[in-house]
Design a protein with these regions (language model features):
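Glycine-rich phosphate/pyrophosphate-binding beta-alpha loops
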Residues: 113, 117, 170-185, 249
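ATP/NTP phosphate-donor binding region
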Residues: 1-39, 49, 267, 274
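N-terminal glycine-rich "phosphate-gripper" loop used for MgATP/nucleotide binding
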Residues: 41-45
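Catalytic core of DAGKc-family lipid kinases
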Residues: 7-8, 18, 56-61, 65-168
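Short glycine/serine/threonine-rich phosphate/pyrophosphate-binding segments
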Residues: 24, 46-51, 70-72
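ATP/nucleoside-binding phosphotransfer catalytic cores, i.e., glycine-rich phosphate-binding loops
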Residues: 156-158, 188, 198-274
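Active-site loop ensemble at the mouth of alpha/beta enzyme cores that anchors a bound cofactor
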Residues: 185-191
Length: 274
């Protein structure tokens, strides 16, 4: 990374390394306070989420250098995993203002969810992600398919939208989310709204049908998927369930308040800067 930056003429960048993504916000906030106008993030979706949470609504631009298992935000924005190309985009590409979602006071850029998806991510852990990669998601999903559904009530922009048994609820800011599936094909990260999907599938057969539709980018045609969009969501569960933000595990809750911050963060993307 240092060598690539040096070849681009950046010889002495301010440099921070952190052992875990949760340690990054403190360093990021210090860099922003010191006047950094461009911040390179070399890491996975968890690192990117933590840093966006710290940088959003400031004037600092983020350049993503993907180095995780899924790299979902980078994939949705067309940012390559090749370090040299990603750095070039950061220095010479255009800037795109993205919306961010906010769940229970914490920002996310790709997705947030509670239920089966969060159980999968919890069981994956950093160790399995590193060893098994995407196959780890398959293992974690199969392990949790027998998990009992829970009662959920959802309001979208203040209106009653869903009430019933569900396996998970997902909120998306982009189209391709968990496991690289296109669950929200209509989603755009700069359209001023979020997508929400409730999955009612239970058991292997139901999930096979649901995932089959998702692979074909037609999840809304599944009888086990309910999809809507809006600016605010109020999600209430009958008991505490684990939840996740951009693939990062969070402590179990039973109520989730979700909103959107439009055009909250600038991200470097492909194309020459104007």
């Amino acid at each position: 990374m240092r060598d690539v930056l040096a070849r681009e003429g950046v010889d002495a960048p301010l440099w921070y390394e952190v052992p875990k993504s949760k340690k990054a916000p403190k360093k990021v906030k210090q860099a922003v306070a010191d006047g950094a106008d461009l911040l390179f993030l070399w890491g996975g979706d968890g690192m990117v989420q933590r840093c966006i949470d710290a940088v959003a609504t400031t004037s600092t631009t983020i350049a993503i250098v993907p180095a995780g298992t899924a790299n979902l935000l980078a994939k949705n924005l067309g940012i390559p995993e090749d370090i040299e190309r990603a750095v070039h985009i950061g220095l010479h590409g255009s800037r795109r203002m993205l919306d961010v979602g906010v769940m229970n006071g914490e920002r996310f850029a790709v997705m947030a969810g509670a239920g089966l998806d969060a159980l999968m991510i919890r069981d994956m852990g950093d160790g399995l992600k590193g060893r098994a990669g995407k196959l780890g998601y398959v293992w974690a999903g199969a392990k949790n398919l027998a998990e009992q559904r829970f009662t959920m009530k959802v309001r979208v922009d203040g209106r009653r939208w869903f009430s019933g048994k569900a396996s998970c609820v997902l909120v998306g800011n982009v189209g391709t989310v968990l496991g690289g599936l296109s669950l929200f094909p209509q989603a755009l990260p700069d359209d001023g709204k979020l997508e929400i999907g409730v999955v009612t599938a239970r058991g292997l057969l139901d999930w096979a049908r649901t995932l089959g539709r998702s692979v074909m980018s037609r999840p809304e045609r599944s009888p086990f998927v309910h999809v809507s969009s809006g600016r605010t969501f109020d999600i209430r569960l009958d008991r505490k369930r684990p939840y996740e933000l951009d693939g990062g595990d969070r402590t179990s809750k039973k109520r989730f308040r979700v909103s959107i911050e439009p055009a909250a963060v600038a991200i470097c993307v492909g194309g020459d800067a104007s």
